[in-house]
Amino acid sequence: MQKTISIILVTILAITAGHVANARERGKVTNLPIPRYVSMKAEEGNVRRGPSLSHRIDWVFKRRNMPLQVTGEHGHWRRVQDRDGQGGWVHYSLLSGARHVIVERDLTPLRTKPGADAEVNAYAEAGVVARLGSCELDWCRVTADGKKGWVQKAALWGVLPEELRD
């Protein structure tokens, strides 16, 4: 009987540990997942060394809709980084939950449906910022400069590899 109970407890612990390992960290302010992606709401945003106006401005993000990855939270401030890993603290009012991505590969095809054999609508150059739509396992629907299509997720920065969107 003791052995059976021990086996059951070990099994429960193993299952629970797996779920805890898969759980993503949550922000202490918003309770939203960390990391997560947001975009620049403003045309410009000061990037500071720390989470307050008294901290030095290290640089300025100057691209509206640019996707950024949130890696931390403190009060009204979000620690973010861009696709090059550069970042710092930005006031939350300069950020939007509207999702955008950056095309990473030059002449990336926008296809009529998910799949490498689907017809090509248009091509996007590397560095193009696109509005993110739905995502399947390996493909995401995007809109860039009025052109819509499906792009391989691996060609985009601003979406998690396991992320699915309706």
Which ranges hold each PLM region?
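Polybasic, low-complexity, intrinsically disordered segments
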Residues: 15-23
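Intrinsically disordered, low-complexity polar regions and short flexible loop motifs
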Residues: 52
